[in-house]
A protein has these predicted regions:
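Non-DNA-binding regulatory cores of transcription-related proteins
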Residues: 104-169
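Intrinsic-disorder-associated, low-complexity terminal segments enriched in Asp/Asn/His/Tyr and depleted
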Residues: 9, 13-15
Length: 185
């Protein structure tokens, strides 16, 4: 399984399944997407509340300018506009996840919608979901931490087209890390 140039023979004796719980047949990608949607709904709820607070602050009688240099109301209106944009972005993210078509990537190259487990040369495993948006989001699924990546992120771009068992290098700054794609579905 490992034993290729990046990892060498030192890992032949390690049972990777002990390091990472491989996805069982009971792991349901629809369940993972639903957890992501739930977290995005919470993000939207918070964005709505923040927008309302910013609107209230912008229209409060105490923010009426007392002189030409008093910019509190103007600043509050900018904040309200920014918060409203956050609401729109959150609604768009939810639309994208709700309309996702669930695909199986077991025998296919990695693409948007794939669940991927990577192991680096230090035997550190991480789980990723390649989503249409919301990169940076982290969710708990099947007692595991899953990081949401987009195809636009450096790691997301590197993963696109890879298949289970492939190895690749990622250079970030002056550090190069080697990974193996252990699981894809």
């Amino acid at each position: 399984m490992l034993g290729k140039p990046f990892f060498g023979d030192r890992l032949e004796y390690i049972n990777i399944s002990c390091l990472l719980s491989a996805p069982s047949k009971s792991m349901n990608k629809a369940e993972l997407i639903q957890i992501i949607i739930h977290q995005l709904e919470e993000k939207l709820r918070i964005a709505h509340a923040s927008t309302q607070r910013a609107i209230d602050a912008a229209t409060d009688e105490e923010t009426v300018p007392e002189h030409k240099y008093d910019t509190l109301a103007l600043e509050a209106s900018y904040l309200a506009h920014g918060q409203a944009m956050r609401v729109q972005e959150s609604e768009d993210e939810l639309r994208q996840y709700r309309s996702m078509v669930i695909r199986d990537f077991t025998d296919a190259p990695i693409g948007v919608g794939a669940y991927v487990v990577l192991v680096d040369e230090n035997n550190i495993g991480k789980r990723f979901f390649i989503g249409p948006c919301s990169g940076g989001l982290t969710v708990a699924w099947q007692d595991q931490e899953v990081f949401v990546l987009t195809a636009k992120s450096p790691l997301g771009r590197a993963l696109l087209g890879k298949e289970e068992g492939e190895e690749f290098e990622m250079k970030i700054g002056d550090k190069t890390t080697c990974y193996e794609v252990v699981t894809v579905f």
